[in-house]
């Protein structure tokens, strides 16, 4: 007889291993925790490793916040070889022996072109859709379509190391950034082509690799230890400012969903009632435009 699944609420930060899909990680986690409802916050390619936050129960309501959050990666680019997918899993489509002589100074001039606001074309092998069809399905059928460019932001781009035909970089970027496309574009700028051979996500929103669990670690934990690995919903917003409700504002907010204009508030704000986190609110130049209520104390609900 199947055990009743638990209605858990919160986030588990996984350190995804190589060669496993994000969906498989999600399903294994659902089984390990006997959880009723789980959801991910954007996938990592099977070849990629690193931070993959998984939301449980009520935390699935705020998955979009993590999808929209900034990310940080460590990426290794192989020069002189291009693949159809832009990474090591694709078929080789071009080779070049004209790899320029690399130096830290030369590579810095190249990387400088990709810092700040960047227009990027996503790769064909991606989950983006064209007329309702995922691009990767069209690519596997040998079809090519015009992929619309998108505006992204690369906040930090640091050269970590390099050798005769490869370089390793650290990238801190906005949502929607494809590191495979960045690898392709860097290869083109160097005049020899290139593709991504390793990718590790080191941060997603507030969650860092140092606090992530490997699936193998979780399998060895007791039930109590597994529950302790779930971080609360507020942790998703730990870098957001706090607004403490005034006594006279509580009825308007709780009973009528109203909130007086707050000219000094903008963007995402944590709402506190005394010392308790109760909601996330979105403000646009002081006007409340969206809100979500949470019971921070409930980790396992009925």
UniProtKB/Swiss-Prot annotation:
Pfam family of the protein (one): TruB_N
Molecular function GO terms recorded: RNA binding; tRNA pseudouridine(55) synthase activity
UniProt keyword Membrane present: no
User: Can you cite a GO biological process for this protein?
Assistant: mRNA pseudouridine synthesis
Q: Which Enzyme Commission number(s) are on file for it?
A: 5.4.99.25
Q: Provide the top EC class.
A: isomerase
- Name this protein carries in UniProt: tRNA pseudouridine synthase B
Protein source organism: Francisella tularensis subsp. tularensis (strain WY96-3418)
| Taxonomic lineage | Bacteria, Pseudomonadati, Pseudomonadota, Gammaproteobacteria, Thiotrichales
């Amino acid at each position: 007889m199947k055990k009743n699944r638990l209605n858990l609420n919160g986030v588990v930060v996984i350190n995804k291993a190589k060669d496993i899909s994000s969906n498989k990680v999600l399903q294994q986690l659902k089984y390990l925790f006997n959880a009723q409802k789980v959801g991910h916050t954007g996938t990592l390619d099977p070849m990629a490793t690193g931070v993959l936050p998984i939301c449980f129960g009520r935390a699935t309501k705020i998955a979009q916040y993590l999808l929209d959050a900034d990310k940080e990666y460590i990426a290794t680019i192989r020069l002189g070889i291009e693949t159809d997918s832009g990474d090591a899993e694709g078929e080789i489509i071009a080779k070049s022996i004209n790899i320029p002589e690399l130096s830290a100074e030369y590579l810095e001039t190249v990387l400088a072109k990709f810092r700040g606001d960047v227009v990027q074309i996503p790769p064909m092998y991606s989950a983006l859709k064209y007329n309702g069809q995922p691009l990767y399905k069209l690519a596997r059928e040998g079809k090519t379509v015009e992929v619309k460019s998108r505006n992204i932001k690369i906040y930090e781009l640091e050269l970590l190391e390099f050798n005769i035909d490869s370089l390793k970089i650290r990238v801190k970027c906005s949502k929607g950034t494809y590191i495979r496309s960045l690898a392709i574009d860097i290869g083109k700028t160097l005049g020899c082509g290139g593709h991504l051979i390793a990718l590790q996500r080191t941060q997603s929103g507030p969650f860092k690799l140092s606090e992530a669990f490997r699936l193998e670690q979780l399998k060895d934990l007791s039930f109590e230890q597994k529950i302790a690995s779930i971080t609360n919903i507020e942790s998703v917003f730990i870098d957001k400012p706090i607004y403490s409700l005034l006594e006279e504002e509580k009825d308007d907010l709780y009973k009528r969903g109203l909130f007086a204009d707050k000219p000094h508030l903008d963007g995402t704000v944590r709402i506190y009632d005394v010392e308790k986190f109760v909601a996330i609110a979105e403000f646009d130049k002081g006007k409340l435009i969206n809100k979500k209520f949470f019971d921070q104390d409930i980790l396992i609900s009925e």
